[in-house]
């Protein structure tokens, strides 16, 4: 067994290294940028090395386990560990955060604080995916709130204070339910409270209590995911945030909610999950149609992409609700796939805004010829979003489809109805995606727009776009690269629903 604290180093390195930024020269923007990027690259290399040489793919148990006693009073430990469910989101976090710091290169105002907040988010995100203690999970969950609030309120658009306040109210409200659920699970059934995931997996609860706990956790995760009707903070937040912040929100933050649903609601509260899974499938199906229809009516480019993210989260809900190894693996693949695609679309939307200073689609048009590189990359990621075969979005959605069809939990007529409605949502996706492309890149409006600086993508922006596009194509061509990480863990997780 390896006793080197790889995960502790990976979790604390960004925030501790980021704190040094606050002592760097105030006017050394270039130094701050390169320092932050180097820290992110070092973190990503450490993570990749630890996983490649110390993680066994065929072992579904928790690996790289670290357990340090923190507070004796209620058995609170610094417990970290990874399995096939968490390794994908951790690698996604490292990859997207590294590219987001490169995307934030134009930020010059208060750049020390900006880059420190990005690194603080990095630690919180990896800490959440690696935590094996419920209270530590909650602490890492809360660690996201202040950095995102400050990034929104200080580097956002004209309505940044409104969107930041709305974000903090929604997420803090959801955190209350998460804390109540953590305390309820930790304090039940024992004279000595325990918050250890390994112990809680085998804990049984009265049906009524388990349902109450499940609902509490679900509300908390539904805000972050987001799940309708708790999604209204997302379009406002994306509409005002800097595009590097949007990359972190769409690529990682939303996936934390989906991860929580699998890790806590599904793994710890399996009996309640089997009761509520049909409702998850129904809500996910409605979400696909509703968000796709709403996206089509959005004038604001970033809000249209935000609603497309809400729509794609519906597939994750359906996969989680299928209680089927195929469907759940599809949901995990969709978490990774949409992390790449959503981050790329917001990055390209932000770079386009930097040039034309327009955000409303009906004011755009005609930028395909002067900006062919941005047009090509935006079109490519739009195709990935609408699930074009050969790209990651198609594989993830197809596996979720197959999972719900082959699920033994639902009647044939129910499965046919669900797949029919899902198919309608998939038809709506190219409608809003292609109309967005048409309004942005075709026509002649832009040539008459004042104060427009129409020049194509530079090397930095092209590098970020291509770096995200490579895994989108790679997963589309060879999805087993991601599925091999989770398949054994999913099989063990679903065994709870067979024997319980």
From Swiss-Prot:
Its EC number is 7.1.1.-. The chain crosses the membrane at residues 3-23, 37-57, 87-107, 113-130, 134-154, 167-187, 208-228, 242-262, 272-292, 305-325, 330-350, 364-384, 386-406, 411-431, 462-482. The keyword Plastid applies. It is a multi-pass membrane protein. It catalyses: a plastoquinone + NADH + (n+1) H(+)(in) = a plastoquinol + NAD(+) + n H(+)(out); a plastoquinone + NADPH + (n+1) H(+)(in) = a plastoquinol + NADP(+) + n H(+)(out). GO terms for molecular function: NADH dehydrogenase (ubiquinone) activity; ubiquinone binding. It is an enzyme of class 7 (translocase). The keyword Transferase does not apply. Its main location: plastid. The gene is ndhD. This is NAD(P)H-quinone oxidoreductase chain 4, chloroplastic. One of its GO terms (biological process) is electron transport coupled proton transport. It is found in: Plastid, Chloroplast thylakoid membrane. It holds the Pfam family Proton_antipo_M. Keywords: Chloroplast, Membrane, NAD, NADP, Plastid, Plastoquinone, Quinone, Thylakoid, Translocase, Transmembrane, Transmembrane helix. Belongs to the complex I subunit 4 family. One of its GO terms (cellular component) is chloroplast thylakoid membrane.
């Amino acid at each position: 067994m390896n006793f080197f604290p790889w995960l502790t180093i990976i979790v604390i390195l960004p925030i501790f290294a980021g704190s040094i930024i606050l002592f760097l020269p105030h006017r050394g923007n270039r130094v701050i940028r390169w320092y932050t990027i180097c820290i992110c690259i070092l973190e990503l290399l450490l993570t990749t090395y630890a996983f490649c040489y110390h993680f066994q793919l065929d072992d579904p148990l928790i690996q790289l386990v670290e357990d340090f006693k923190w507070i004796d009073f209620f058995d609170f430990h610094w417990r970290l560990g990874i399995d096939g469910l968490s390794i994908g989101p951790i690698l996604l976090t490292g990859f997207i955060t590294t590219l987001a710091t490169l995307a934030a290169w134009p930020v010059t105002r208060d750049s020390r604080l900006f880059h420190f907040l990005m690194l603080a988010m990095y630690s919180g995100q990896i800490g959440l995916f690696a935590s094996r203690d419920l209270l530590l999970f909650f602490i890492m969950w809360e660690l996201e709130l202040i950095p995102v609030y400050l990034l929104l309120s200080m580097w956002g658009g004209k309505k940044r204070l409104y969107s930041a306040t709305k974000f903090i109210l929604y997420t803090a409200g959801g955190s209350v339910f998460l804390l109540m659920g953590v305390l309820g699970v930790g304090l039940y059934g024992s004279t000595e409270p325990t918050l250890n995931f390994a112990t809680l997996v085998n804990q049984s609860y009265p049906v009524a209590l388990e349902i109450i706990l499940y609902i509490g956790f679900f509300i908390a995760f539904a805000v972050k995911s987001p799940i309708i009707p708790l999604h209204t903070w997302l379009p406002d937040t994306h509409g005002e945030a800097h595009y590097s912040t949007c990359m972190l929100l769409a690529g990682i933050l939303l996936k934390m909610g989906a991860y929580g649903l699998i890790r806590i609601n599904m793994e710890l509260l399996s009996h309640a999950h089997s009761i509520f899974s049909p409702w998850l499938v129904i809500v996910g199906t409605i979400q696909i149609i509703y968000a796709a229809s709403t996206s089509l009516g959005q004038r604001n480019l970033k809000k249209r992409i935000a609603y497309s993210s809400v729509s794609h989260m519906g597939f994750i809900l359906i996969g989680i609700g299928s209680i089927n190894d195929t469907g759940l693996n599809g949901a995990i693949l969709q978490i990774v796939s949409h992390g790449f695609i959503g981050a790329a679309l917001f990055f390209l939307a932000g770079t386009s805004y930097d040039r034309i200073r327009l955000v409303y689609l009906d004011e755009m048009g005609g930028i395909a010829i002067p900006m062919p590189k941005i047009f090509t990359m935006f079109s490519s990621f739009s195709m990935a979003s609408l699930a074009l075969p050969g790209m990651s979005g198609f594989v993830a959605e197809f596996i979720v489809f197959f999972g719900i069809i082959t699920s033994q939990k639902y009647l044939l007529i129910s499965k046919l109805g669900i797949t029919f409605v899902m198919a309608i949502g998939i038809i709506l996706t190219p409608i809003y995606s292609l109309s967005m492309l048409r309004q942005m890149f075709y026509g002649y409006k832009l040539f008459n727009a004042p104060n427009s600086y129409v020049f194509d993508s530079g090397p930095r922006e092209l590098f970020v776009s291509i770096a995200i596009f490579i895994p989108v194509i790679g997963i589309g061509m060879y999805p087993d690269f991601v599925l091999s990480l989770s398949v054994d863990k999913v099989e063990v997780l679903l065994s709870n629903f067979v024997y319980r």
